[in-house]
Curated annotation (Swiss-Prot):
The gene is rplK. This is Large ribosomal subunit protein uL11. It comes from Mycoplasma mobile (strain ATCC 43663 / 163K / NCTC 11711) (Mesomycoplasma mobile). GO terms for biological process: translation. GO terms for molecular function: large ribosomal subunit rRNA binding; structural constituent of ribosome. The lineage of its organism: Bacteria, Bacillati, Mycoplasmatota, Mycoplasmoidales, Metamycoplasmataceae. It comes from the Bacteria. Disulfide bonds: none annotated. Forms part of the ribosomal stalk which helps the ribosome interact with GTP-bound translation factors.
Amino acid sequence: MAKKKEVVRVAKLQFNAGQAKPGPELAGLGIVMPEFTKQFNDATRERSGEPVPVQIIVYKDKSFDFKLFTAPTSFMLKKAAGIKSGSANSKTTIVATIKKSQLEDIAKYKMPDLNTKNLEEAMHTIAGTARNMGILVEGYDDIVKAREEAKLAAKEAASAAAFEAKLESDAAQLLAENKQSAEVEVIKEKDKGNKDE
């Protein structure tokens, strides 16, 4: 039986498919960088344009093995939706919709890296990521309801921001008039019941 190699380091990195180059992220691993980049690029050449997560196992003798993973879910969703970035606030801004068939394709693609072998569970997981990015799934999400909720949340956020700005302005005006410091505490609606007790 062959002696098992001693692992000295395990690193998780990400490179564009077929485009890994020697650099600082690899230098710290103590492997022969050109050898890794050649093997990685050969193994990922057909996945052109994809970011490819990779786990590199480094052994004491400076040899290595690596394992490739599927592209990140966010990348696949943005690609399916035809957008460059997700929503900064998915509760108030919906940036795109995708079809249920696209969701299913992404779930099938991601299955090797998910901790489920059930397609429906995988789709549910991917749909959750999509919602967090401001992407809705036709035939899976209630799009009309989600858009209405987003409009309401955006209106509430704008109203709260305007109210807070007015409070800050009023506090600054009081300070200027009195030329002394004062502490201003904002009491939210849900806090009112607790203060009165």
